């Protein structure tokens, strides 16, 4: 199979979908890899590294799309890429369709096969291709929250961990999954007063067992959230429903009840966000303020630490990419239940329920396209 890896062109997206080591593994399996020139530079990989691994370099994104049977990316195609995608071309990347109707309609119209990293799901309901970036984003959410809590960035002026004789900041984490767990580890390790809210009592018991004493757990309901946001210094939105729009758990009317200078970090922004006031931002302009509350809603947070993120992502995605290349997408999906759940849009059909529900589109069972 001919594999193409374009350079990411989303704002400040410095990750690349394939490392030189990953390219070498694909070539070793008998396939051809074409990298767009300088695609790996943001992650510290030179074109020469890819050539030494057996890949070929093409100067433009147009040439990569034109020659490839499968495109491997990090983030969803943006509007300028829509016209480059061919009928029957496989796209393997993060799509987050449920938060982007124009993207969904474009992919339905071009006849492509869209395999979304974020909905590849194991039998135990874990999401192996989302976990690495959730780990990165969860840890980064506390770094960013602590930074914007500083007065020079408009925050309340509180040191996250406090000092002897002065209490630490209060951190509220909504959602106890991978993002929430990693955020709690970071905030707890820095000495903050942390509360994790989740709907699953089983998950809360687990978190209560593994977290230090300064990390507490609480059942998620509107009353508890409404009360907790009033005194929080940093609020992390970490709620996920795989492939579907995130629920809006912090509503517009809660914002004025918060302290001026409170920092809200919505890690769920890729799926529409779990704050009603969320609007996607970029690394160039990461924050906005509503009622004196700072909102950080960058949709590609791990893009700011591309070396770590690229290595972590390729470790997870490469085995699946090789399966698709070796067997073709149909056979690979038929033989791998987890990969089959990654199919979202196939040749003009929506085959993932969450995407269909998000836009009121007809849903077809994935078996009809295999």
What are these regions (language model features)?
Residues 209-292:
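Rossmann-like adenosine-cofactor binding region
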Residues 6-42, 152-240, 287:
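Glycine-rich phosphate/diphosphate-binding loop of Rossmann-like nucleotide-binding domains
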Residues 33, 57, 91, 114-115, ...:
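Hydrophobic beta-strand scaffold residues
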Residues 118-159, 269, 274-370:
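Adenosine-phosphate binding glycine-rich loop
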Residues 2-110:
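An N-terminal-biased, well-structured beta-alpha scaffold segment characteristic
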Residues 2, 8, 77-169, 298-300:
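Glycine/serine-rich phosphate-binding loop and adjoining beta1-alpha1 elements at the start
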Residues 69, 75-76, 95-96, 221, ...:
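Short glycine-/small-residue-rich Rossmann-like dinucleotide-binding loops
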């Amino acid at each position: 199979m001919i594999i193409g890896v374009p350079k990411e062109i989303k704002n400040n997206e410095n990750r690349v979908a394939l490392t030189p080591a990953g390219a070498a593994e694909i070539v070793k399996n008998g396939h051809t890899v074409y990298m767009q020139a300088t695609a790996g530079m943001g992650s510290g990989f030179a074109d020469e590294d890819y050539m030494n691994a057996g890949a070929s370099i093409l100067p433009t994104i147009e040439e990569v799309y034109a020659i490839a049977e499968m495109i491997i990316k990090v983030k969803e195609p943006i509007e300028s890429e829509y016209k480059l995608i061919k009928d029957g071309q496989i796209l393997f990347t993060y799509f987050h369709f449920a938060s982007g109707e124009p993207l969904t309609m474009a992919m339905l119209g071009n006849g492509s096969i869209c395999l979304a990293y974020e909905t590849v799901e194991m039998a135990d309901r874990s999401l192996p291709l989302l976990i690495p970036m959730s780990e990165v984003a969860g840890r980064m959410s506390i770094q960013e929250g602590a930074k914007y809590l500083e007065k020079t960035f408009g925050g309340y002026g509180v040191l996250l961990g406090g000092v002897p004789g002065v209490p630490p900041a209060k951190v509220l984490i909504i959602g106890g999954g991978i993002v929430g767990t990693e955020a709690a580890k970071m905030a707890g390790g820095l000495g903050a007063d942390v509360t994790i809210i989740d709907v699953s009592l089983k998950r809360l018991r687990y978190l209560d067992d593994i977290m230090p004493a300064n990390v507490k757990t609480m059942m998620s309901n509107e009353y508890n959230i409404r009360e907790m946001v009033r005194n929080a210094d940093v609020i992390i939105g970490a709620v996920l429903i795989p492939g579907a729009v995130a629920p809006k758990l912090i509503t517009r009317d809660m914002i004025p009840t918060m302290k001026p200078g409170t920092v809200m970090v919505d890690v769920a922004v890729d799926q529409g966000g779990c704050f009603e006031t969320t609007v996607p931002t970029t690394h160039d302009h990461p924050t906005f303020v509503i009622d004196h509350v700072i909102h950080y809603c960058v949709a590609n947070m791990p893009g700011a630490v591309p070396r770590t993120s690229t290595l972590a992502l390729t470790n997870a995605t490469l085995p699946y990419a090789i399966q698709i290349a070796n067997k073709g997408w149909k056979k690979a999906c038929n033989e791998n239940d987890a990969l089959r759940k990654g199919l979202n849009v196939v040749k003009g059909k929506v085959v993932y329920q969450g995407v269909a529900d998000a836009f009121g589109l007809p849903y077809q069972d994935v078996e009809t396209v295999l």
